[in-house]
Amino acid sequence: ETRCGTMVASTSLLHSEVQEAVKDLMAAEGWDLEIVEFTDYVQPNEVVESGDVDANYFQHVNYLNSYNEEKGTHLAIAGNIHYEPRGLYPGKQSDLAAITDGAEIAVPNDTTNCARALLLLEAEGLIKLDPEAGITATENDIVENPHNIKLVPLAAEQVARTLEDVDFGVINGNYAMEAGLTSADAVALESADSEAIQQYVNVVAVKEGNENNEGVQALVKILKSDEIKDFINENYKGSVVPYDGE
């Protein structure tokens, strides 16, 4: 017996693949999950705000908060599902403990990913940032650089292709996957409890007041189930990681 229909909006192939895996598990519990795909990052929030769609699964916490602030919308988090860790990958060097003076590290040149790269380098003890910088850190916020590391800013999708020309590179999970790299190849990864992951964990979002909607709760429960965690781990090899927190 089908208890109810739940509509969920998504954008990327990753989110759609995960939701297709969820669909059968939802059906087994009597839910008809309808997936509505979009090609931009605005419409999925518009249809949730309007009530046309129950939930969406495509964005991280930081984007949701910024969207609410900019648009005056009332989106809320129903569940934290996964994160896509940035990794520090070896190029001409592979041992962080023996990093040479003046080593070149390729980093994404966009604001968000550059900040995450800098926070990762700080977590590994390679640089020290102004403590006030947080997830808005830029190269100007580096207050200690004992190894005289030289940052090489590149478009995020280009970093993996330039590893042979630099000593290390900080690569987004999706681009690492496209380059045939896995998390096991990285010499360092963002940790689940890092400041960056708390802001960039991907969530199921609903309109405020619908967090406890029965269908939404069923969706979140299944997205956080062992079956879906196994699906993510097997298919994305550490480039996408299930979030174990609440």
Which residues are covered by each model-predicted region?
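Short, polar/charged alpha-helical segment
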Residues: 5-32
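Periplasmic-binding protein-like
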Residues: 114-122, 223-243
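A bilobed periplasmic-binding-protein/Venus flytrap-type ligand-binding module shared by bacterial periplasmic
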Residues: 85-96, 200-213
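A conserved helix-loop-strand patch within extracytoplasmic ligand-binding domains
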Residues: 78-127, 229
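Ligand-binding "clamshell"
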Residues: 66-78, 91-94, 165, 170, ...
